[in-house]
Amino acid sequence: KMSLVTTKKMFEKAFEGHYAIGAFNINNMEIIQGVVNAAKAQNSAVILQVSKSALKYAGPLYLKAMVDAAVAETGLDIALHLDHGPDIETVKECIAVGFTSVMFDGSHYDYEENVAKTKEVVDFAHSHGVVVEAELGKLAGVEDEVKVDAANATYTDPDQAVDFVKRTGVDSLAIAIGTSHGAYKFSGEAKLDFDRLDTITEKLEAAGFHNFPIVLHGASAVDESSVETCNKYGGKIAGAKGVPNEMLRKAASKAVCKINMDTDLRLAMTAAIRKSFGEKPEAFDPRGYCGDARKLIQELVEMKIKDVLSSTDSMK
């Protein structure tokens, strides 16, 4: 019987191969199927991740059962990951259900407390064979539970990153280099601090952390065609702006092994459903419009896997 995997091997291959694995936020069956169908078509490993509010919305047992079904159906390497775990209780709940990877987000605590709390999570998770992602430096924007205004967003300090990894034993690190959560990422021109990313990687390498995987949060491109479709069919999404795909591609070719996307899936799903409602006002079978949403999510994720993550054929 196929079962879920951790991200350990995935990230080793991704680092060596200069690509990244997509981590897609899931909330329901159609999103799971859209993402996994895309990964299967591209023969790519994939991370399905669940935020605290997704746990509340769908229930951990339903989400786990659907993801198990995806593994059984596709035979792909799939990791089930807790995104932005706010506390050790949530981490423990997810590990008990069978998640293979957890993120503890202590970035809103002061540094020493973040270290202490993260280490506690790492010790518990590792004793259960589960890998841990942590975050250092705050990302601006809004995503589910996470709200940080741009003025309070800080870039990750490279020396602190090394100290943090040393003292906590985390398996991967989410850093702040200019991305932000939500659909409104940049008011001006999009900029990512690649020099900072390189410095963090070099310093980790020098400290004995070989090929240490870096994670990029808030990395939706905010696809214009989805926004246009939403607005054409009655939506009001103004001024949305994401991270250009070519910047993400560059990050994936460096130490970034995991790129998180949530907003893009939300927009695609909403665009497909609005279009369906607009074009077929007489229809009322949810399988019609939910099926359209699943199909558009698959197309979007296939494009991401091919052109942004470059993780096509990573199952080989």
Please give the residue ranges for each predicted region.
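C-terminal alpha-helical cap/extension of soluble enzyme domains
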Residues: K232, V243-K316
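Generic N-terminal amphipathic, Lys/Arg-enriched alpha-helix
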Residues: T6-G22, A283-F284
